[in-house]
A protein has these predicted regions:
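C-terminal catalytic/acceptor-binding lobe
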Residues: 82-155
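Conserved catalytic core of nucleotide-sugar-dependent glycosyltransferases
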Residues: 11-104
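Residue-level detector of anion-binding/catalytic polar loops
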Residues: 7, 24, 129-131
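Short beta-strand and adjacent tight-turn residues that come in two discontinuous sequence segments
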Residues: 3, 28, 133
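Surface-exposed, flexible loop/turn segments at secondary-structure boundaries
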Residues: 9, 33-34, 138, 146
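General alpha-helical segment detector with a strong preference for membrane-spanning helices
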Residues: 9-11, 120
Length: 155
């Protein structure tokens, strides 16, 4: 499954790179549409350093859904972990169609979580690792940048 928001500017080579990584869940982090900031939460080692795999990708707790790729097996793991998310459509004409509510908003620990972050939390709970390439460059609204530059500019 490939998710790309219509207001994100991206490089086609990045999609090919994500395919070549052969990972269950991989994506990119782009600047916010309202300001040139990157919203992310990395998974860190005990010493506070980033977890980086052999491909140079960073482990993340969550990523925005505007640029991510998942294998079918990843979705199947999430469905198996959250069978209660299955639903049947109200429209009886679609009686042989069902779905799973994996992209939904919710209140988690007293805080509102948007659908992309809920999806990532569920992915993590299903045992998936979430990886991002910090070198992918995006535009979003009038802002442009890559995660690595944002990390480099942090104190």
């Amino acid at each position: 499954m490939l998710c790309i928001d219509s207001d994100i500017g991206w490089n086609a080579q990045d999609v090919l790179d994500m395919l070549s990584y052969d990972l269950e869940f991989v994506g990119g982090i782009y600047p916010s549409r309202q300001s040139n900031i990157f919203i992310f939460r990395p998974y860190l080692k005990e010493d506070g350093s980033l977890i980086v795999n052999d491909k140079g990708l960073f482990s993340m707790e969550y990523v925005p859904a505007g640029f991510m790729m998942l294998k079918r097996e990843a979705i199947e793991k999430m469905i198996a972990k959250f069978p209660e998310s299955r639903f049947e459509p109200k429209d009886k004409e679609l009686k042989n169609v069902s779905g799973w509510a994996l992209f939904n908003t919710e209140i988690y620990d007293g805080e509102f979580w948007g659908e992309d972050y809920v999806f990532c939390r569920k992915a993590r709970e299903a045992g998936l690792e979430i990886w991002v390439n910090p070198l992918f460059e995006f535009t979003h609204g009038k802002f442009k940048g890559k995660l690595l530059d944002a990390l480099s500019s942090r104190p």
